[in-house]
Amino acid sequence: MFNYERPKHFIQSQNPCGSRLQPPGPETSSFSSQTKQSSIIIQPRQCTEQRFSASSTLSSHITMSSSAFPASPKQHAGSNPGQRVTTTYNQSPASFLSSILPSQPDYNSSKIPSAMDSNYQQSSAGQPINAKPSQTANAKPIPRTPDHEIQGSKEALIQDLERKLKCKDTLLHNGNQRLTYEEKMARRLLGPQNAAAVFQAQDDSGAQDSQQHNSEHARLQVPTSQVRSRSTSRGDVNDQDAIQEKFYPPRFIQVPENMSIDEGRFCRMDFKVSGLPAPDVSWYLNGRTVQSDDLHKMIVSEKGLHSLIFEVVRASDAGAYACVAKNRAGEATFTVQLDVLAKEHKRAPMFIYKPQSKKVLEGDSVKLECQISAIPPPKLFWKRNNEMVQFNTDRISLYQDNTGRVTLLIKDVNKKDAGWYTVSAVNEAGVTTCNTRLDVTARPNQTLPAPKQLRVRPTFSKYLALNGKGLNVKQAFNPEGEFQRLAAQSGLYESEEL
């Protein structure tokens, strides 16, 4: 670890700016032969805006041998041994470093004598340094290094020391670089390559800041101090090379097929789509947007399976559905046809007119007729006295048409056909029944009365008499005699009173 303690050979024998010399005489004395040890405390300044390279060092060795200091003059014969020349150190650390560093010729001017040489000039006569110069000697001015150059040298030294300390701390024993929390999170979110590109861009921006700072302090007076840009194993990346996020257009991996669903049933359309970023999905029915409501739901599972759900399929849901997936890179579309089978409206059977009770004679034929309305058409059951009637026989037949009219025909009716007849109509919506009575009577045996004898009077004699007598009509038709005959036959007699 670097030690900021000042070595013994860095002890300054004379302060050119702040030292005060007491006049020579019996009360003054030269410096003691013992060297005085002092330390320089330099507070490192945090520089967040400037970063220097990992290899920038100060190659100038700040060394000075003890022989560079002149020997202390002999004590005056009449001087007090307890008195010494005192030097007041009121100089800043930067000025002190400038005083001990070897001078450098200015790049824009002629060579300036070193400060150390000017501070420790000796006279040709061997006059001590601390002795007061004679009045005849010409006083030479002491050149001073500008403060901004001294400050730049100090900052370069401090930054180089800080870099070395941080470099040791960031390297592991196996030589791999320790990742910071930000780098770990960036690798987890963006991937190793993208994270490296991000931090490399940051390093390049920091290198540019360092170069800008170095250009401002280009007039440093330390010739061997050279600032180099940090080199990384990932290579140089320009600031203009921004991270290019990749986009992938939507692509349907799984699509549903055309389907036919009964009205009132549950329906579900599943599909899968890929793309980066995740595409937005929308549905259209015959060009109209499908809105999510109580009967229509759009969901996405954890595995990326999209679904369009119909809780209850209605007739209005039939049509061509178009699914559109869209993101920044593009869009994709697929269509599916949904056919809805209309639900049949069912209606329970109902008698339009019912069969009537009838009474027939044995040997006759009879028809029991009714009309039933129902959707779908019902099944019919005929019973006689709670027993099923056997159809399709020579005597009994059942007829039914599309209008719902039903006819039960019974031929050659006998006594066994009499009783209560029940007709039942049954379908999916319900059932209905109706009862009727059939009575059969025996045919009666009738006796015919004997025919009445009629007496017929012949009339040939009259016509013969007429024909024989000619025109004598009175003789041919005797009214009195005829009247008496009719009266005798009818039982009428002529009253004597008349």
Curated annotation (Swiss-Prot):
Region span, Disordered: 1-46, 64-151, 202-241
Keywords: Actin-binding, Cell membrane, Cytoplasm, Cytoskeleton, Disease variant, Immunoglobulin domain, Limb-girdle muscular dystrophy, Membrane, Methylation, Muscle protein, Myofibrillar myopathy, Repeat
Region ranges (Necessary for interaction with ACTA1): 215-498
Region (Necessary for interaction with ACTN1): 79-150
Start and end residues of each stretch annotated as Necessary for interaction with FLNC: 215-493
Keyword Membrane carried by entry: yes
One Gene Ontology term from the biological process aspect of the record: homophilic cell adhesion via plasma membrane adhesion molecules
Residue positions, PTM Omega-N-methylarginine: 20
Composition-biased stretches (Low complexity): 29-43, 202-212
Bias type Polar residues, positions: 77-138, 222-235
Pfam families: I-set
Role according to the record: Component of a complex of multiple actin cross-linking proteins. Involved in the control of myofibril assembly and stability at the Z lines in muscle cells.
Subunit structure of this chain's protein: Homodimer. Interacts with ACTA1, ACTN1, FLNA, FLNB, FLNC and MYOZ2. Interacts with the C-terminal region of MYOZ1.
Annotated family: Belongs to the myotilin/palladin family.
Name used for this protein in its record: Myotilin
Protein encoded by which gene: MYOT
